[in-house]
Amino acid sequence: CDDTCKDPSSWETEFPRCGGLHQSPINIVTRKVHVTNNLPPLIFIGYTDIINITVENKGHSAHFALPPSVRLTGGALPGYYRAAQFHFHWGGKGRPGSEHTIDGERFPMELHIVHIKEPYSSLAEAQHDRAGIALLAFLFEETTDNHPHLDTVIAALGLVQNNGSATVIPNFRLSDIIPPASDLHHYYRYVGSMTTPGCEHAVAWTVFHRTLSISSRQLDAIVKQCRFWTGLPMTDIYRPTQPLDDRIVYSTNSGTTPKSVIHLWNSFCLAVLLTSALTQ
Ligand SMILES: *[C@@H]1O[C@H](CO)[C@@H](O)[C@H](O)[C@H]1NC(C)=O
Ligand SMILES: [Zn+2]
């Protein structure tokens, strides 16, 4: 097993970037985000296609592989991105396990959909581009009702309990587990890193304002499905929040964040900053 399995505080001995600046995840302080009109909606391509996906227990997390027909653009991203995989971060029984926190609040679970910029074909190639990877993050909120499509995912996790085991979910649709695109116009954007080694500093992060629902029954089921490579229960799989350093978190204008008046000149400056941050 690689160092992903060790305690996050020891990652940097083998992966120096993990101890560097501009790491992820972060705590988003809504009072301090820069509200901008320059974050248009993302454009989801192939998200409604019916696909067969392979789920594999990677020893530290379970990855759901996505075909390259699932793509992403828009949202002020510099180009088109191809989906690679999605995975979840969770806590333990009764313990929340999201990676990003909002005003210090940790959510029960977080979904990450990883996309690699075209024409790169791997994380290794994309990591040299500051926006080589586009990561979509969805925070889950505990509800009394079940998430209607999450049981497929839970059942699949039950079939990949041990490191290296894999299964296929037939007839899966990504759009079944996330809200419709029309509900995803509002999000936070910042530039950061992968949250596992090597902590590649190449990620344009999108954290949606809209949360996903999960019942306590589903949450309990998820956290007890898998085991780490060590054989211990796979719980609390999230990296602690990292310092913001000199970064700015941008947000689309919506009711859930404080609205601030932005003059035309300010918007122009933000657009320039954002574009340069993403294309450096
Ligand atoms: C999914 O797998 C089934 C069974 O192997 C196959 O019949 C079907 O064509 C596959 N669907 C897609 C979209 O690839
Ligand atoms: Zn992740």
Regions found by a protein language model. Name each.
Residues 1-280:
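Alpha-carbonic anhydrase
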